[in-house]
Amino acid sequence: MSSGYSANQYENAFNSQKLQNWTVPKHFKERPSAAQGHTIFIASDRGHLLPGVKAKRGSAWPDFKGTWELPAHLPPASINPTARSEEGRQRLTHTYTHSGHGIHTHRAAKTTAAPAADGQTEGDQTCNAPTSERPVTGERPVTGQSGRGERPLTQASEREQSLTLTYSKRREQSLEETPQLEREEPQ
């Protein structure tokens, strides 16, 4: 289909002969001329360097470190507490502090912390639970449960818990105590 068209059919339409200023446009060759000299072969047909050709010394990746060049102790992961719940941040902090690795936390902004009831500022508070209540590293509570039932993990579970309480209270109410609109009529 394209055998009847030349390769430069569109090119000539965009070659401006008048640049709308006083400079003369520079015309380049349509096809470049051949390079001077000849190509020197440095490798055989099998891809090996020919004798007499100097091989380049040094590595192409000078900064690469293999497994054996890595340090014996890798630096610990840093925890970014942004967009985490307080309980999730404490769990991560606890896991890293008790796993034998150090911990680095990022602070997004410096806030003015009001002193807590025990005199500590909000930023100075740490997990002061007795060691018997702390889970051993690696033993995390099952998703949806928080340790020993202290409080739910998310706001959604708090909402669900409050809804179940209201439904159970409604069931406990007698039929006479409920208003006329809320009564369920037996069918």
UniProtKB/Swiss-Prot annotation:
Cell location: Cytoplasm, Cytoskeleton, Cilium basal body; Cell projection, Cilium; Apical cell membrane; Cytoplasm, Cytoskeleton, Cilium axoneme
Any Pfam family matching the protein: CFAP126
Polar residues compositional bias, start-end: 122-131
Positions of region (Disordered): 97-187
Keywords noted in UniProt: Cell membrane, Cell projection, Cilium biogenesis/degradation, Cytoplasm, Cytoskeleton, Membrane
CDD domains: Flattop (cd23705)
Principal location: cytoplasm
InterPro entries cross-referenced by the UniProt entry: Fltp
Cellular component aspect of the GO annotation: apical plasma membrane; axonemal microtubule; ciliary basal body; cilium
Comp. bias intervals (Basic and acidic residues): 169-187
Any GO BP annotation: cilium organization
Known function: Microtubule inner protein (MIP) part of the dynein-decorated doublet microtubules (DMTs) in cilia axoneme. Acts as a regulator of cilium basal body docking and positioning in mono- and multiciliated cells. Regulates basal body docking and cilia formation in multiciliated lung cells. Regulates kinocilium positioning and stereocilia bundle morphogenesis in the inner ear.
Family named by the database record: Belongs to the Flattop family.
Name listed for the protein in its UniProt record: Protein Flattop
Organism: Salmo salar
